Amino acid sequence: MKERLFIISQYLLPHHLLSRLAGCIAECRVRWFKNAFTTWFAKRYQVDMSQALVEDVTAYEHFNAFFTRALKDGARPLDQTPGAILSPADGAISQLGPIEHGRIFQAKGHSFSVLELLGGDAANAAPFMGGEFATVYLSPKDYHRVHMPLAGTLREMVYIPGRIFSVNQTTAENVPELFARNERVACIFDTERGPMAVVLVGAMIVASIETVWAGLVTPPKRELKTFRYDEAARAPIHLEKGAELGRFKLGSTAIVLFGPDQVKWVEELKAGSPVQMGQALAQSNA
């Protein structure tokens, strides 16, 4: 009964209004308030600050600065195995595996379309048909910057408006096509393994998504918007393996897509496996 009421509330709550209010709170610079809130949050979610570049939670100018905190040098060493494909973020594997019939497995009884995930552009979706996916969920306690699994040159970024359902096991099991309905930013790169997509999926209370090349990605009007970076008028944007790609101001999910026969997932990884940015998720196929 409790789970059912929670799911019903997900459809009734004013998602974007709540996220705007959360954004105001997260950017508040009133010292006593931001210190109290940040301290409470760190204790409530058992945030490990020992690896943070700034360990004192009260030293951040606002909650968002704390939430998107940088880590100390060496805190996330990159797997040096030749051909390793890195985890883009700290978190847990929600699902990973093959893309079958153009759909990505979400949870028992649920899947979603690659085409819809990437904003409805068939040309963007086509290279990933029959390919592979990995979905990494970032919990509140995690490091919330997203990094490159593989070196790549940015071809296109697509902002896709949508709902902002909470993202957790309950919603994954009960909200159809959850990740293709939530607001998200799809980044498509050209890599040595062919096209790679990294999709940053928002969630309720996620105030914003940023990328290192565009900053805050929320167009004034919440409508689908495509930004192309392979045109002569724009300087190429190349990011090395392990380089920061973007960040969540309050977190959610990163989904990585590859084409057919390009990668093989690490056998030990399965749904629920904890991962850290920089560890190997997969190995390039020869």
From Swiss-Prot:
It is a peripheral membrane protein. Coiled coil: none annotated. InterPro entries: PS_Dcarbxylase, PSD-B, PSD_type1_pro. It holds the Pfam family PS_Dcarbxylase. Its EC number is 4.1.1.65. Catalyzes the formation of phosphatidylethanolamine (PtdEtn) from phosphatidylserine (PtdSer). NCBIfam families: PS_decarb. This is Phosphatidylserine decarboxylase proenzyme. It comes from Pseudomonas fluorescens (strain Pf0-1). The gene is psd.
